[in-house]
Amino acid sequence: MYSKELGINFFGNESNKKRQLNKIEILKKNIKNLKIFLIIAGTNTSQIPGISAAGINAKSRRKTALADAEFLLEGASKDHKYKLPLLNAGVTPALISHVCSKLINIYPVIVPLGIGAKPYFNHLDVEDRNLGPSNCLTTGKSMTKERVLNLYEKGLAIGKSLQQPVLISESVPGGTTTAQAVMEAFGLQVSNLVGSSLFKAPRELRRKVVKRGLFNANFKANFDSFDVVAAVGDPFQAFSMGLLIGARLAKQPVILSGGSQMLAIILLVLEFLDEKHKDEFIEDVFIATTGWLVKDNSLNDLVNLINEKYDVKLLGLASPLNFKSSKYKELRDYELGHVKEGVGAGGISLLAFLDGFKNEEIVSLCQLNLEMMKDLGQISLEKDC
């Protein structure tokens, strides 16, 4: 029904049409009552040359998450503090998320972790900002286990306190690489399936980075999810794991808006949960992403790997948003495979479609905001910003 009318694609466990429609109804019913979290996090894995398109170089990638969060909240503004880093192609997905969150009239909550700066805009503090980004995963010592457990407990407490459905999104430069490391730590061979913000995923580079990190981690017998995040993960994973479990304990549906980084969270939780609770846990958990990320089917394969390993029925939904008709190259670049996802673009745009907004309306507003960004000098023109 809705999937055919709106062009929503399902992926993962698609066996039950009634279940698909029920998922759509749950989302549609809860649009106006959602709590959206954008977790912006720092990992020094992002400083590896060529690892991420979230900024044209290592220096710019340090500011990407702050600039994304600012734009998500404020949109194009002459009073912006953070310039959006120049990308080789495309434009920040925060543009999509800003436009669509305004359309559905939801104000996101920003959670900064390991950013090393106190944002001037409204945000939720959960740890000492002086802790800074997690170490590069190649060290095998990304964070202390104490920090991981503290972030998990903070996320758990916040999740359990919620009385409304939750959407979790992220801006974590280098995060797909830490996601791959987490999944491979638990035995999933995913190096050819994990996506990238880059047009051509740096698979060989990531393979080497992950291999080195896992070697240096030197896991002992009976290691758990917290051990893995401490060794090769990032702050986003530790906090989001708690937030997801807490929200489900509060019986709230949860939308994980993204790709492989969200699947890494699912995997960490499934490894942690008692076997008998897995089906109930996964029933009202949604993966929502952009159509650009599911084009080559690798995300579908990744979801099915997790479904098979843990004997669950995780279902994904892909937003029908497209920029084929856009007059701007930066937006049409998405159709060529650049950027693809981030800052909750897939999940938040999906909600806008379910709320009745049309593709041409969203494209028009994205174009308008892009014009304003350029006019206000909000995108850096320097390759080193």
Swiss-Prot record:
GO MF annotations for this entry?
nicotinate-nucleotide-dimethylbenzimidazole phosphoribosyltransferase activity
Query: Origin, by domain of life?
Result: Bacteria
Tell me the Gene3D superfamilies matching this sequence: 3.40.50.10210
List the residue ranges forming a coiled coil, or say none.
none
InterPro entries linked: Nict_dMeBzImd_PRibTrfase (IPR003200), Nict_dMeBzImd_PRibTrfase_arc (IPR002805), Nict_dMeBzImd_PRibTrfase_sf (IPR036087)
Q: What are the transmembrane regions?
A: none
The cross-references to PANTHER family, in alphabetical order and at most eight, read: PTHR38811, UPF0284 PROTEIN SLL1500 (PTHR38811:SF1)
Membership in a protein family: Belongs to the UPF0284 family.
> What's this protein's name?
UPF0284 protein A9601_04941
Gene source species: Prochlorococcus marinus (strain AS9601)
